[in-house]
UniProtKB/Swiss-Prot annotation:
Keywords assigned by UniProt, alphabetized: Glycoprotein, Glycosidase, Hydrolase
GO terms, biological process: cell wall macromolecule catabolic process; pectin catabolic process
Active-site residue numbers: 135 (proton donor), 245 (nucleophile)
Record protein name field: Arabinogalactan endo-beta-1,4-galactanase
Length: 332
């Protein structure tokens, strides 16, 4: 079994405030954390935004839901976006008021990370994993940390890692770097080779490499390409490896891109979700030091397309009832 069998549940309180009542597969209302735990989930992933306008996904929001997760026996994986909003390959907007020169920005990032980690510890939350940035293939904290300036990226990540290492968190979490397109070895190799050759970010600064792996953004995102890429990553850097975001649709009438060849026979249904997640988990398990799989936001039913061209990638019905696919976490 994988060490980390997880889901991202960041939007749980947003949905509860919108009136969603989550139900288990039998139709009985229960807190989402209990439904997840009963279906084999052992870790929840949570995105942290620095100062979002409405407060959703800020540190206080995350501490509140992390306490619920901990009470349900779940581990917590904190995903720092280092932005006031979404951070991904198309968006890495520096938080409002942060300095843009590299010296002051490095200190700001270190101190922000240190302070957030200490606040988690003081609240009784000891995350098992902390990601320093989210999908940072194109860098982080733009414009200073764009890939045109690898030296800045290396310095920023070193500062973030040491914010965790110097914190009062005990025990210390695994520190992760997270890129998208986990199937693309060329991209992973280009990125890590460039950032590590700067000499500032050391291999000892981090423990895990996380990747996103979605089937609906490129026909090149085959399961076989994922396996090859993760095998190469493990062989080259000897880090723990996890697929930290993935989805499979229960409805996808008008996909924008052709699906990868080796998943085309998988149906768009809860049964298909079970098959796809099992296949991805088997690949991670087959990789040296492959340790985890996280499904992205399976309970965000008011945003069911989850940013894709597929109509619904969640593992809950629109009325909030868990689908049969949620139990896949008992078997990976």
């Amino acid at each position: 079994a994988l060490t980390y069998r997880g889901v991202d549940w960041s939007s749980v309180v947003v949905e509860e405030r919108a009136g969603v009542s989550y139900k288990n597969t039998n139709g009985n209302a229960q807190p989402l954390e209990n439904i997840l735990a009963a279906n084999g989930v052992n870790t929840v992933r949570q995105r942290v935004w620095v100062n979002p306008a409405d407060g959703n996904y800020n540190l206080d929001y995350n501490i509140a839901i992390a306490k619920r997760a901990k009470a349900a026996g779940l581990g917590v994986y904190i995903d720092f976006h280092y932005s006031d909003t979404w951070a991904d390959p198309a968006h890495q907007t520096m938080p409002a008021g942060w300095p843009s020169d590299i010296d002051n920005l490095s200190w700001k990032l270190y101190n922000y990370t240190l302070d957030a980690a200490n606040k988690l510890q003081n609240a009784g939350i000891q995350p098992t994993i902390v990601s320093i940035g989210n999908e940072i293939r194109a860098g982080l904290l733009w414009p200073t940390g764009r890939t045109e300036n690898w030296a800045n990226i290396a310095r920023l990540l070193h500062s973030a890692a040491w914010g965790i290492k110097d914190s009062s968190l005990s025990p210390k979490p695994k520190i992760m770097i997270h890129l998208d397109n986990g199937w693309d070895w060329g991209t992973q190799n280009w990125w890590y080779t460039n950032v590590l050759k700067q000499g500032t970010l050391e291999l000892s600064d981090f423990d895990m490499m996380g990747v996103s792996f979605y089937p609906f953004y490129s026909s090149s995102a085959t399961l076989s390409a994922l396996k090859s890429s993760l095998d190469n990553m493990a062989k080259t850097w000897n880090k723990e490896i996890a697929v930290v975001e993935t989805n499979w649709p229960i409805s996808c009438p008008n996909p924008r891109y052709s699906f990868p060849s080796d998943v085309k026979n998988i149906p768009f249904s809860p049964e298909g979700q079970t098959t796809f997640i099992t296949n991805v988990a088997n690949i991670v398990s087959s990789v040296s030091r492959g340790v985890g799989l996280f499904y992205w936001e399976p309970a965000w039913i008011h945003n069911a397309n989850l940013g894709s061209s597929c109509a619904d990638n969640t593992m809950f019905s629109q009325s909030g009832q868990a689908l049969s696919s949620l139990s896949v976490f008992q078997r990976i």
